[in-house]
Regions:
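Catalytic-core regions of core metabolic enzymes
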Residues: 1-175
Length: 175
């Protein structure tokens, strides 16, 4: 769906499957290898909860700037471990992590990093931030019905410990 929406998907990472292709895109063994070969700056995690913390930290170490963790059920202690790990980076180096248990990020008419139904969004000037994917979709659809568009919609996730708070995302909207 991200490719259909126009997002610039450059490859994937699956340890042990480097050198293969999926959806006609290269697959790499590590995020570092993917970044080196593609210049990727964003990542999306579609991994089992037990591997999510290591995947997020690997993305940060590889220089990924924005990461979306779609996966739900990441143990709270793993999210705490990720947040502590991220303290090693300066503010300008720190990866932005959205999720877990989220729908992702969409800027209508531009790009999507997630699993949102792109057809319900109209391009515009209103920002949406939601813990619930479904409520975010409903807000976007109601705005569209009123002919009001969305600049960006961010689903920060419904798990107890998130990578980004409402305050963090409002700060990004203000930048």
């Amino acid at each position: 769906e991200m490719i259909k929406y126009g997002s610039n998907v450059v490859g994937g990472v699956t340890p042990g499957k480097g050198g293969s292709k999926h959806l006609n895109l290269p697959v790499f063994n590590t995020v570092k290898e993917a970044v080196k070969n593609t210049g990727a700056t964003a990542s999306i995690l579609f991994v089992p909860p037990a591997f999510a913390a290591d995947s997020a930290m690997e993305a940060a170490d590889a220089g990924i700037r924005s990461c979306v963790a779609i996966v739900d059920g990441i143990p709270s202690h793993d999210m705490i471990r990720i947040k502590r790990y991220m303290r090693r980076y300066t503010k300008s180096e720190k990866m932005s992590l959205v999720g877990p248990n989220c729908a992702g990020i969409i800027s209508p008419g531009k790009s999507m990093l997630g699993i949102m139904p792109g057809h319900i969004y109209k391009e515009g000037r209103v920002g949406i931030i939601s813990r619930s994917g479904t409520l975010g979709y409903e807000a976007a659809q109601q705005l569209k019905n009123l002919n009001i568009g969305v600049s960006t919609s961010v689903g920060i996730g419904g798990d107890p410990i998130n990578g980004s708070s409402f305050r963090d995302i409002i700060g990004k909207f203000e930048e």
